[in-house]
């Protein structure tokens, strides 16, 4: 392992804000050890103040890292090096003594459920990257809380970074600053170390003034040491270490040890016309509409949806047996393309101020632009693409990167739930799994039991563009929408979910599966989606209340005739939308069987195997 971070205080960095003396002892040791290793010129201990934020933005503007968007209030645009635009699964690793602690050993080929790296290989990689990596730069010390400060479900981290973009983004995405250090005291924290990997003076010029080191990028998680170590990328998912690295990969491992769940799920509150409210959590793969569902304007009169979170849920059963959930984040880091007044009016309202945009296009009047924004341009207004080139609608290339983002405070969302920062969390009564399935999978079905529901999560598949070929679409396995984010062996993760059924007094939520994306033979969507999805939530609400509105099918319960409220909705072919074809499902079950047998292999819990066999049996009798 890399030398335990470190003793001896031979570093010359000058502390330009805050004081090392004021830090809790363990934090101070962490800062000093890494200052000695990375050799920054300055150390800045972040206080999280408005003033500090303003100074960071001004500094980045001066350096040409961001520019001000004059059309909005305190909004900024960053354009990255085109080689640093997304999470990189091939360079994201988990280090444990045994490979099997991280991933099941697959029958053939490589695991698709995570990447393990040995301690020896990591030590070499670490020592080839970090010594001196912050020369000439400032090391920022970011104390942050995932979850409302003081919540029993919250966890604290300290991130050291040489990127002011990371500091500014972390101030939006987490609770950050002095109050966190006060709450931490001598408590435990997750150690996060991040460097863009560009010591000064530069060896080669930056692209777009964006510091990164793509050749040496590595994002490493050391769950046994409660550490995250990231090098070479400034992009959100790789550098905002509170997000996927901590809130999913490290937290899922903590959750297994401590008896809770850390999941890639939105959390929403839905209130019926009588004023009765329920909370639901939903797991969809990235870019399948989590943010749109979490911020939905229901088309059904009298129904109301409110947003607790759009991406991550930390959930734990309380003493009364209610599954309580918090959103560990403080902001939304949303995909911009496709966001419009039609698809997500509440997101559009949220991002009008105090927002950092990354890799979207800019209009000549100081606004933002992207594919699917659906906004008419004023006469004479031109567009500059994310590659900083003039762009015209007829151009073949998109104006915004497909993974371009907005980073915006959750508190600005017009429909943020009144309990979104409740320290004890909100009670979850339904869990929804879903993906993008053009054929075969009905609009909604309900699992037969908790065990069957866990199987449904394990069997999740979703259409993804085959990035390698740029040809057709392929259906990818994405169990629990967690495939890129598991912090430990997926077989053990399934066993952990199954174990929730044995908690004393646990009120297990109902589990549902949805598919907004089924198409007819001409390739047209069978369901209008967006605000109309409230009709599906209404049916779930009734089911949770014990309504007799479902009929049994081989794959689960679907709405009875006329149980789904389609009032005012013309032209929906219900038969096609809910059709369950024996031929399709025989193939589907074979595919799931092959995947679980190959990928989870001997770590597959018996209960999941039993659910698979039972489903096979039911389909064969259709």
Curated annotation (Swiss-Prot):
Modification after translation (UniProt): Acetylated. Lysine acetylation by p300/EP300 is increased on high glucose conditions and promotes ubiquitination by UBR5, acetylation is enhanced in the presence of BAG6. Deacetylated by SIRT2. Deacetylated by SIRT1. Ubiquitination by UBR5 leads to proteasomal degradation.
Native organism taxonomy: Eukaryota, Metazoa, Chordata, Craniata, Vertebrata
Binding positions for GTP per the UniProt entry: 287-292, 405, 436, 530-533
Activation and inhibition: Phosphoenolpyruvate carboxykinase activity is regulated by acetylation and glucose levels. The anaplerotic conversion of phosphoenolpyruvate to oxaloacetate is improved by PCK1 acetylation on Lys-91 (K91ac), Lys-473 (K473ac) and Lys-521 (K521ac). High glucose concentrations favor PCK1 anaplerotic activity by triggering acetylation on Lys-91 (K91ac). At low glucose levels, SIRT1-mediated deacetylation of Lys-91 promotes the cataplerotic conversion of oxaloacetate to phosphoenolpyruvate.
UniProt entry keywords in alphabetical sequence: Acetylation, Cytoplasm, Decarboxylase, Endoplasmic reticulum, Gluconeogenesis, GTP-binding, Kinase, Lyase, Manganese, Metal-binding, Nucleotide-binding, Phosphoprotein, Transferase, Ubl conjugation
A Pfam family the protein falls into: PEPCK_N
Disruption phenotype: Mice do not survive beyond 2 to 3 days after birth.
Main subcellular location of this protein, as a coarse class: cytoplasm
Annotated region described as Omega-loop, given as residue ranges: 457-487
Protein name: Phosphoenolpyruvate carboxykinase, cytosolic [GTP]
Coiled coil residues, start to end: none
Metabolic or biological pathway, per its Swiss-Prot or TrEMBL entry: Carbohydrate biosynthesis; gluconeogenesis
């Amino acid at each position: 392992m890399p030398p335990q971070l470190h003793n001896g205080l031979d570093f010359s960095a000058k502390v330009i804000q805050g004081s090392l003396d004021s830090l809790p002892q363990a934090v101070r040791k962490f800062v000093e050890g890494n200052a000695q290793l990375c050799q920054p010129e300055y150390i800045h201990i972040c206080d999280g103040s408005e003033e500090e934020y303003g100074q960071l933005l001004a500094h980045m503007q001066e350096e040409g890292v961001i520019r001000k968007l004059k059309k909005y209030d305190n909004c900024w645009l960053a354009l990255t090096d085109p080689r640093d635009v997304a999470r990189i699964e091939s360079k994201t690793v988990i280090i444990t003594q045994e490979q099997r602690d991280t991933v099941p050993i697959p029958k053939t080929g490589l695991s698709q459920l995570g990447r393990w790296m040995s301690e020896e290989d990591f030590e070499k990689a670490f020592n080839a990257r970090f010594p001196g990596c912050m020369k000439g730069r400032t090391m920022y010390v970011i104390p942050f809380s995932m979850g409302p400060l003081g919540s029993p479900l919250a966890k604290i981290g300290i991130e050291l970074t040489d990127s002011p973009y990371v500091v500014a983004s972390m101030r939006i995405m987490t609770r950050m600053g002095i109050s966190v250090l006060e709450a931490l005291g001598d408590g435990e924290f997750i150690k996060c170390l991040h460097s863009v990997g560009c010591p000064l003076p530069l060896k080669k010029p930056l692209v777009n003034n964006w510091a990164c080191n793509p050749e040496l990028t590595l994002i490493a998680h050391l769950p046994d040491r409660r550490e995250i170590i990231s090098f070479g990328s400034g992009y959100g998912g790789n550098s905002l270490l509170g997000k996927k690295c901590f809130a999913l990969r490290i937290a899922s491992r903590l959750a297994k040890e401590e008896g809770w769940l850390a999941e890639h799920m939105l959390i929403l509150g839905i209130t019926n016309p009588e004023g009765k409210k329920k909370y639901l959590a939903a797991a969809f793969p990235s870019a399948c509409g989590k943010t749109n569902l979490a911020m939905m304007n229901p088309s059904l009169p009298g129904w109301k949806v409110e947003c607790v979170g759009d991406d991550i849920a930390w959930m734990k059963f309380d003493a009364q047996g209610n599954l309580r959930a918090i959103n560990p984040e403080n902001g939304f880091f949303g995909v911009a393309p496709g966001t419009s007044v039609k698809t997500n009016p509440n997101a559009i309202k949220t991002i009008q101020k105090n927002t950092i945009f990354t890799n979207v296009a800019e209009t000549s009047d100081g606004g933002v632009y992207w594919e699917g924004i659906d906004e008419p341009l004023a006469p004479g207004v031109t567009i500059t693409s994310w590659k900083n080139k003039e762009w015209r609608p007829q151009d073949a290339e998109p104006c915004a990167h497909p993974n371009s983002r907005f980073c915006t405070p959750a508190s600005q969302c017009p429909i943020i739930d009144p309990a979104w920062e409740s320290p004890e969390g909100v009670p979850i009564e339904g869990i929804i799994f879903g993906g993008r399935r053009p054929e075969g999978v009905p609009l909604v079905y309900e699992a037969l039991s908790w065990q069957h529901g866990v199987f449904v999560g394990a069997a999740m598949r979703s259409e993804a563009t085959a990035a390698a070929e740029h040809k057709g679409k392929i259906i990818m396995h994405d169990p629990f929408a967690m495939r890129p984010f598991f912090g430990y062996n997926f077989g053990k993760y399934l066993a952990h979910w199954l174990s929730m059924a044995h908690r004393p007094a646990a009120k297990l939520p109902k589990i549902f599966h949805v598919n907004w994306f089924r198409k007819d033979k001409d390739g047209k969507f069978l369901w209008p989606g967006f605000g109309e999805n409230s009709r599906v939530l209404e049916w779930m609400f009734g089911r949770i209340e014990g309504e007799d509105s479902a009929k049994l099918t081989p794959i689960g319960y679907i709405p009875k005739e006329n149980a789904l409220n389609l009032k005012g909705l013309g032209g929906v072919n219900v038969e096609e939308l809910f059709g369950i074809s024996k031929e399709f499902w025989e193939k589907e079950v074979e595919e799931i069987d092959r995947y679980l047998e190959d990928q989870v292999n001997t770590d597959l819990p018996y209960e999941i195997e039993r659910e698979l066999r039972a489903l096979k049996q039911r389909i064969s009798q259709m």
